[in-house]
From Swiss-Prot:
Belongs to the UMP kinase family. Disulfide bonds: none annotated. This is Uridylate kinase. Keywords: ATP-binding, Cytoplasm, Kinase, Nucleotide-binding, Pyrimidine biosynthesis, Transferase. It comes from Sulfurisphaera tokodaii (strain DSM 16993 / JCM 10545 / NBRC 100140 / 7). The gene is pyrH.
Length: 226
């Protein structure tokens, strides 16, 4: 299989060494089983910190996005160095560079590409370019809920849903300003739909279960494109 793994910036914010060890072991197992893997890292609180300071000082949205992109590349380099025996040692900065590095057969790890989108769009573009079997969004919740689980105790996890349902759920939190994206930005959803990319949302604390979740044997959400 060809897999794209998008690691939420929150993974980096937690600074949990066990999570990093588990990620490294999972990636080694996936590669040893003969699958190909690309990883996209989010910008997390480092991106938000720089964007917040810049915004308060009147920096424009394009420049704020660039700050976010560089923060996501910093996270991408952390993963690159942690996985140096498997990974391509340069973080690609656009889709052409990514495609070129992918030919190396190594795990290619990337952050942001260009302003106006989030790293979820990068993950969707990369998935499209390599015809990935699955795009896996590893975040700090177990999957997609019918309501925001942070504010609704009765929120239910949806094990299967389509992009139409997802768009309705995300409607309340959608924004295109730097640093404000939640899970998937509108452009990422458009790309997922136009190329019918299958998306899995799962908790990064259960990364060792990726293959089980893909096969519907463990907790997570599978999003079918409409
Ligand atoms: N960003 C971009 N383009 C990209 C990736 C990220 O402009 O291709 C910026 C956005 O401002 C985004 C921030 O909110 O970097 C951090 O990425 P993310 O963690 O929100 O995905």
């Amino acid at each position: 299989m060809k897999l794209v793994l998008k690691i939420s910036g929150k993974f980096f914010d937690e600074e949990n060494i066990e999570n990093f060890i588990s990620l490294r072991n999972t990636i080694k197992n996936i590669v040893n089983e003969g699958h190909r893997l690309a990883i996209v890292s989010g910008g997390g609180s480092t991106a938000r910190k720089y964007i917040k300071i810049g915004r308060e000082l009147g920096v424009n949205e394009a420049h704020l996005d660039l700050l976010g992109i560089w923060a996501s590349r910093l996270n991408a380099y952390l993963l690159t160095f942690i996985l140096s025996d498997l990974s391509y040692m340069k973080v690609p900065e656009n889709l052409e560079e990514f495609i070129e590095k992918w030919e190396s057969e190594k795990v290619v790890i990337t952050g942001g590409f260009q302003p106006g989108q989030s790293t979820a769009t990068v993950a969707a573009l990369v998935s499209e370019a390599i015809a990935a079997d699955y795009l896996i969004l590893a975040t700090n919740v177990d999957g997609v809920y019918d309501k925001d689980p942070r504010y609704n105790k009765d929120a239910k996890l949806l094990s299967k849903l389509n992009t139409e349902t997802l768009k309705k759920i995300l409607e309340t939190s959608q924004s295109v300003k730097a640093g404000t994206y939640e899970l998937l930005d509108p452009l990422a959803i458009k790309i997922i739909e136009r190329s019918k990319i299958k998306v899995i949302v799962m908790n990064y604390k259960r990364l060792n279960k990726i293959l089980d979740i893909i096969h519907g044997k463990d907790i997570g959400s599978i999003i079918e494109p409409m």
